[in-house]
From Swiss-Prot:
This is Probable GTP-binding protein EngB. GO terms for cellular component: cytosol. It comes from the Bacteria. Belongs to the TRAFAC class TrmE-Era-EngA-EngB-Septin-like GTPase superfamily. EngB GTPase family. Gene3D superfamilies: P-loop containing nucleotide triphosphate hydrolases. Mg(2+) binds at S37, T59. It comes from Oceanobacillus iheyensis (strain DSM 14371 / CIP 107618 / JCM 11309 / KCTC 3954 / HTE831). HAMAP family: GTPase_EngB. CDD domains: YihA_EngB (cd01876). Keywords: Cell cycle, Cell division, GTP-binding, Magnesium, Metal-binding, Nucleotide-binding, Septation. Residues 22-195 form the EngB-type G domain. Its cofactor is Mg(2+). One of its GO terms (biological process) is division septum assembly. GO terms for molecular function: GTP binding; metal ion binding. The lineage of its organism: Bacteria, Bacillati, Bacillota, Bacilli, Bacillales.
Amino acid sequence: MKVNHAEIVISAVSKKQYPEDQLPEIALAGRSNVGKSSFINRLINRKNLARTSSKPGKTQTLNFYRINESFYFVDVPGYGYAKVSKKEREKWGRMMEEYFQTRDTLRAVVLVTDLRHDPTQDDIQMYDFIKYFDLPVIIIGTKLDKITKNKRQKHINRAKQVLEMDETDLFIPFSAEIGEGKDEAWSALSRYIKR
């Protein structure tokens, strides 16, 4: 997909702040600092629409990015960052649950994981959380370029096994650095962003 227009519209903390234009939405979930912002930036060929951070736990809101006036990427708070207080984690949990449960324009969730390592307990919990709400999920295994070619399939198989992925869910190996997996990601997303 060629992206001609991309902008951050709002950083929301509750549903009364969500955009009201009824465009389809794709949520992006993943551990803090796993590469969600880099994933967005690579897909849309922009260096810094989604701000990348060296500080984990920086995204504390639902960030709505309108793409081509036709759909939204919604970056949800990263999880698994130990220095965030329990109270703060609970607040994020409620915010995400409200979004996943009540948002009828939410079409699918992209779960971003680090392909170099086994999915964490938090990744498994998030995958199960998404499935609980009966939402389509696409797993993006980032940092593909950091794994030697002869070990990639082993890492992919292991990630699928640890997550106990449904066969109907897609797993796409991806590199924000070199763009590998970008076409496959757009192809997977395109079925959910048509109105």
